[in-house]
Amino acid sequence: MKRVINALTAAMLMAAIVPTATRAAEPTQAGTQGITQPVSGVLMHPDYIKAVARQAYLWGWPMVNQLNRSQTITKAPHPGLMGGILPVAPRGKIGMLHDYITPSETFVTCPNQDVVYGLGFFSLNDQPVIIQVPDFGDRFWVYALYDQRTDQFGELGKPYGSKPGFYLLAGPEWKGEKPEGVEAVLRSLTNLNNAIPRIFMDDTADDRAAIQEKLNQVVAYPLNEFDGKMKTIDWKNTPDIPNPNADKASSGETRWVIPEKFFDQFPQVLESVPPQPGEEALYAQFQALMDAAGKDPAVKKLLVDTAVESEKQLIQPFFQWKHNGTPAGNGWNRSRNNAQFGYDYFNRVATAKSNMFENRPNETQYFYTDFDGAGAQLNGAHSYSITFAKGEEPPVKGFWSLTLYNQHHLFSENPLKRYSLGTKNKNLKKNADGSLTLYVGPSSPGKDKESNWLPSPKENISLYIRAYWGEQAILDGSWKPPVIKKIH
């Protein structure tokens, strides 16, 4: 009897209840014409279903993540700060902070307190979007524009010599002409996109005041609202938007991918994100799997079970920095292919899990670690020193910083309200030999060293160096991050 039950169970999983006649799927691109497509009506056995489902989960995780973020952020009735914390806006517009982001932020891991952030999501199949660029003068700035794959498109920022003015963001189907008064058209390969402006600000009262006028001109809106005049929003006094999840305490990043719902959303990704050259075969396998699941509840259940398993086995390990990028020396890893992932599915999903929305390598290089120089896990109950030899601070044309994150890759509030140190800090003290030592620990390293101290929570922590607009030594990897020494 047991053997009969097992056989029936297997048969339910294998049977994709579809017509037995074979059919060739329509080719997704001209290059696939004449290539045989998967046959419908085959009996997919459980291990095959699981193998393809695991690949689909790994491949599609960043795009489902992006989809869910967009649906949450664009519920805002007007541009502003959700809960007084996170910039949000209706679809086609943008919200801006007016100061550094706070420790209460859990929308995205690895925030930084060197820049003032903005955030907006766009559906460019509705119509193009205009985004404004003020005259930032000598201040570093970059607008990172991401498609649904989390690859950047367009070039907009100080590293590119972008002019102040108006820029048009267009989707793949838009066939209009560049309007008069618009500097350039920046075209995305997907219709779902988001923009994250990053505007550098010194950690001084004077610069906080000086930057406000420029921030108020960082505005985005649909093309049909464009009149050639620079619009302004007083971001500091814009009414806050209630956070619908304010009563749901969270110690980590918001869960943007729910495994049990992943394969309900995955068909939308296949529909809205066109394949890259050479990905047509992947799409064909994924679509055949979804067709089978749509006709057989047993197949669908196995997909859900596989998604739950894959979240634990495939995705969660990417939260460890050793699985993100490549070794950079002295126990650190460095980002690779950030925001221009292409076929690099490994680093795309690693970044989406651990530190989504990085900048391109020429805009920013990231160095990160969970370990000290001896290979031991960093823990905020201990104290550490990081010394940059004279002239060996990160060589940049923009700015650099060292940030401390808690076990969730977020800020843990401290009395100094200090979460990073670097270019923005005008009171860092150098050693007599010209070197610079920064300190990490739960207690002050001494009054004379306190300006160089990052207070740490008593839990596992990680350290993170940003090098914005790096010099050649940053780009080619010849610059190495310093050793992290545990202070005994």
Residue spans for each PLM region:
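Gram-negative bacterial Sec-dependent N-terminal signal peptides
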Residues: M1-R23
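A compositional/structural signature for long, glycine/proline-rich flexible linkers
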Residues: A25-H488
